[in-house]
UniProtKB/Swiss-Prot annotation:
Pfam families: ATP-synt_ab (PF00006), ATP-synt_ab_N (PF02874), ATP-synt_ab_Xtn (PF16886), ATP-synt_VA_C (PF22919). One of its GO terms (molecular function) is ATP binding. Belongs to the ATPase alpha/beta chains family. PROSITE patterns: ATPASE_ALPHA_BETA (PS00152). It is a peripheral membrane protein. Its EC number is 7.1.2.2. Transmembrane segments: none annotated. Keywords: ATP synthesis, ATP-binding, Cell membrane, Hydrogen ion transport, Ion transport, Membrane, Nucleotide-binding, Translocase, Transport. It comes from the Archaea. Component of the A-type ATP synthase that produces ATP from ADP in the presence of a proton gradient across the membrane. The A chain is the catalytic subunit. InterPro entries: ATP-synt_VA_C, ATP-synth_a_Xtn, ATP_synth_asu-like_sf, ATP_synth_asu_arc, ATPase_a/bsu_AS, ATPase_F1/V1/A1_a/bsu_N, ATPase_F1/V1/A1_a/bsu_N_sf, ATPase_F1/V1/A1_a/bsu_nucl-bd. ATP binds at residues 232-239. It comes from Methanococcus maripaludis (strain C7 / ATCC BAA-1331). This is A-type ATP synthase subunit A.
């Protein structure tokens, strides 16, 4: 064990001497209070340490003790429904242990309870040959999730002993006879946060992640295993969009990282999620959620740790064959923490003061997303989707964090303050957003909705772009000066915006829209477009088309329950549309 001495303190950065024998990224205990820190630079016998707790009050001459291990997370039953800080300290347990609403410095509480006993059901038997990643038993962790206990990395052999019953995470549930001797298997394992968990290989992103948000699913779809960025200025709805994704996404587990954002936003999640039901299982949303709260008033160094802690937990659930959504709100705050620490280290600054390695750090994080074939002899597949919010100052998408993020991710949901001011939510700008997964996921949509899904989607997108071009003319000469065909295009684009893209996150029905309902809504609007053009070509007045009463039915379809809408209302609206538009033809 290496014991050094503090020689310099600069905010969250501490320099210690006498650290020869230490390793990069080793966790150390700093000062008399034993603050948790991590070595980020080694020079001869000096170590530069970033401290994950407030450094006020420590002074040169105090000791620094190495632990001999990198920053790691504990993985096992008990993580779901938990709320951690950036270095996986359980906030509820800290409050119970210290009777304080603040985190005392140097406090050390196990990340996973060592007291709770879990009912372990073995799925393997004595004599079975097992390899890394094989499931040997299960634990019903919450009503929604069956936690699979896996053989840890680097262990393979024959099961000599396996137990059944109630155990804590530290008790031995199985013994495996390996080439190096007997290995005891517990329900908990540790993993260094900076090291991606291995898999057999990545798979093509061909299945869409259904979020229930029409603009995201139909126009700018994210594939399972994909990465997406949500940049937007203040007040444009980043957090509500991420809450919607966490509530409704077609995943098994959600890891929500509040990275440097307001504490109130985490409070909203804690208050809301326990009362919301998961549409897949009917159980509470909190049963499938892990929260990592690293709010803006917590030490900046822990922001980086919170992002890596979150992705490691997500990869662990992925290795069980589950689908995981990781939302990070906001990666800009992590980048600002990097900038602050880089400045303390007196490194050469890059663009806008951010460190030169900003893009490689972002890439290391986003590249840990993916749909993979999991380790083990069974055919397990899991995925991690990453959705990172970006908060560009003043909504400037050319700033370094946004521009570097866009080089890495394949889906860009651009939030627009002007749309938010016009009360258009979700405020995703359909002209600047894009998805590079559309070609990959179109096959799934055509198979699960209808063969004309892609053509409808592309035609609707081109109408919205055409509307943007026509708006410049309309502002100069007014809509009445346009040809009849283009007046119909303006009306249909308005219907697409207001009746399809707009979605009420707080409405009981409209908060979530299934793929089938999305398809039929789009189909009705595009059918109205085609029939409207036919009517105009045969002499109908565009003003009359704008005044038909069926438009009211189209506007209300988003609030109808799916079964009623698809089975009864769709044919009714189509029939009414044909009769009303037919009556306009002279």
């Amino acid at each position: 064990m290496v014991v050094g001495k503090i020689i310099k303190i600069s905010g969250p950065v501490v320099v210690a001497e006498g650290m020869k024998g230490s390793q990069m990224f080793e966790v150390v205990k700093v000062g008399n209070e034993g603050l948790t820190g991590e070595i980020i630079q080694l020079t001869e016998d000096e170590a530069i340490i970033q401290v994950y707790e407030e450094t006020a009050g420590i002074k040169p001459g105090e000791g620094v003790t190495g632990t001999g291990a990198p920053l790691s997370v504990e993985l096992g039953p008990g993580m779901l429904k938990a709320m951690y800080d950036g270095i996986q300290r359980p906030l509820n347990e800290i409050e119970n242990a210290t009777d304080s609403i603040y985190i005392p410095r140097g406090v050390s509480v196990p990340s996973i309870s060592r007291v709770i006993k879990w009912d372990f059901e073995p799925t393997a038997a004595v004599g079975d040959e097992v390899i890394t990643g094989d499931v040997i038993g299960t634990v019903q962790e919450t009503a929604s999730i069956v936690h699979k206990i896996m053989i840890p990395f680097g262990v393979s052999g024959k099961i000599k002993e396996i137990k059944s019953g109630s155990f804590t995470v530290e008790e031995t549930v199985a013994v495996v006879e390996t080439a190096d001797g007997e290995k005891e298997i517990q329900m908990m394992q540790k993993w260094p946060v900076r090291k991606p968990r291995p898999s057999k290989g990545k798979q093509a992103p061909v299945i869409p992640l259904i979020t229930g948000q029409r603009v995201e699913d139909t126009f700018f779809g994210l594939a399972k295993g994909g990465a997406s960025a949500i940049p937007g200025p203040f007040g444009s709805g980043k957090t509500v969009t991420q809450h919607q994704l966490a509530k409704w996404s077609d995943v098994d587990v959600v890891v929500y990282i509040g990275c440097g954002e307001r504490g109130n936003e985490m409070t909203e999640v804690i208050e809301e999620f326990p009362h919301l039901d998961d549409i897949k299982t009917g159980n509470k949303l909190m049963d499938r959620t892990v929260l990592i709260a690293n709010t803006s008033n917590m030490p900046v160094a822990a922001r980086e740790a919170s992002v890596y802690t979150g992705i490691t937990i997500a990869e662990y659930f992925r290795d069980q064959g589950l689908g995981v959504l990781l939302t990070a709100d906001s990666t800009s705050r992590w980048a600002e923490a990097m900038r602050e620490i880089s400045g303390r280290l007196e490194e050469m600054p890059g663009e806008e003061g951010y460190p030169a390695y900003l893009s490689s750090k972002l890439a290391q994080f986003y590249e840990r997303a993916g749909r993979v074939e999991c380790l083990g002899s069974e055919n397990k597949q899991g995925f991690v989707c990453i959705v990172g919010a970006v908060s560009p100052p003043g909504g400037d998408f050319s700033e370094p964090v946004t521009s570097n993020t866009l080089r890495i991710v394949k889906v860009f949901w651009a939030l627009d303050a002007n749309l938010a001011r016009r009360r258009h939510f979700p405020a995703i700008n359909w002209l600047t957003s894009y998805s590079l997964y559309i070609d990959d996921i179109a096959g799934w949509w055509q198979q699960n909705t209808a063969a004309d899904w892609r053509s409808l989607r592309d035609e609707a997108m081109s109408l919205l772009q055409k509307e943007a071009e026509l708006q410049e003319i309309v502002q100069l000469v007014g809509p009445d000066a346009l040809p009849d065909r283009e007046r119909v295009i303006l009306e249909i684009a308005r219907m697409l915006r207001e009746d399809f893209l707009q979605q009420d996150a707080y409405h009981e029905v409209d908060s979530y829209c299934s793929p089938i309902k999305q398809y039929h809504m789009l189909k009705i609007i595009m059918t109205f477009y085609k029939k409207g053009l036919d009517a105009v070509a045969k002499g109908a007045d565009p003003a009359g088309i704008s005044a038909v009463t069926v438009k009211g039915d189209i506007a209300r379809m988003k609030y109808l329950v799916e079964e009623e809408f698809v089975n009864t209302k769709v044919p009714e609206i189509i029939n009414k549309m044909e009769s009303e538009l037919g009556a306009l033809i002279k």
